[in-house]
Structure formats: structure tokens, C-alpha cells
Amino acid sequence: MSGRPQAVPTVQVDNAEVIVTEWRFAPGAETGRHRHGHDYVVVPLTDGTLLLETPEGDRHAPLVAGQAYFRKAGVEHNVINASAHEVVFVETEIK
């Protein structure tokens, strides 16, 4: 365990087509290492910076409120809020 606070997921929709989850990250909060089993789209609700810990190395990723991005299934990472404020995004996994 890293000792970081945990990001808070709230599943809003889970049906045969999609899983829609709102993620809230306090400063320094993390998801924990995980692998995505589905393609997914993220829509940031706040600006901020995430630290992505991946098998290929760490990198920072800026978030811009309202600027969506898409990722393919198989992505493996731990997502950490590297901002000094809460970061919120909605993730839609496509089944």
C-alpha cells in the first residue's frame, strides 16, 4: 500500500453497453494499479494534472475541463492527482 488517500469512484450507469463512473481525487489521491478491460473515454470536469504510474514509466498528464480523450482496453496504470486541488472526471467504459 502506498499510504496515499484513495480516489472515490461513483458508478452512475452500469448496463450491457457501458459503465459510467465519476472519479473524485483529493490532492495526492490514487486509484491503485489497475488494467482496463474495456475501451474507455474520460471527460474531465476540472482542470488539473495527473501522475500516471505505468509499467513503461511515470508521466504527467494535463487535464482540461471538457476536453475528452479515448484510450484502448489493456491500459495498465495507477492514476494519482498531482494537483493541489480536487480533480474530477467522468469515465465511460464501452463494453
Curated annotation (Swiss-Prot):
Read off the CDD domains from this record. Answer: cupin_BauB-like
Q: What positions does the domain Cupin type-2 occupy?
A: 23-90
User: Which BP terms from GO are recorded?
Assistant: beta-alanine biosynthetic process
Describe how expression is induced or repressed.
Answer: Activated by BauR.
The family database entries (Pfam families) matched by this protein are listed as: Cupin_2
Give the disruption phenotype, in one or two sentences: Cells lacking this gene grow normally on putrescine, cadaverine, and GABA, but growth on beta-alanine is completely abolished.
State the function annotated in the UniProt record: Involved in the degradation of beta-alanine.
- Would you tell me the protein name for this molecule? Beta-alanine degradation protein BauB
